[in-house]
Amino acid sequence: EDEFVLSFHDINPQKKIHALIIPKGRYIDLDDFSQNASVNEIVGLIKGINIVAKKLGISADEGKGYRALSNISDHGGQEVPQLHFHLFGGEKVGKMVS
């Protein structure tokens, strides 16, 4: 947790490492966030994703890598009306869309 984001492990992990990263502002999805968040909030979220990846040992710097995913609206599979990113890693994550 920092000034801009809150992060925690998913209670129903889909991969070996599965964390959620949530901006502290109230934003419905990435569209809402990109249109209404401050520059500091946007930078804070992007940097927050990288910080969490490093803390979990899955950043590209460690030669591993990860997938950051955010579902947007009905066709994108969004179930919770709060912007959040899923961070998957610790193993190969497979194809982009099944």
What are these regions (language model features)?
Residues E1-S98:
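HIT superfamily nucleotide-processing domains
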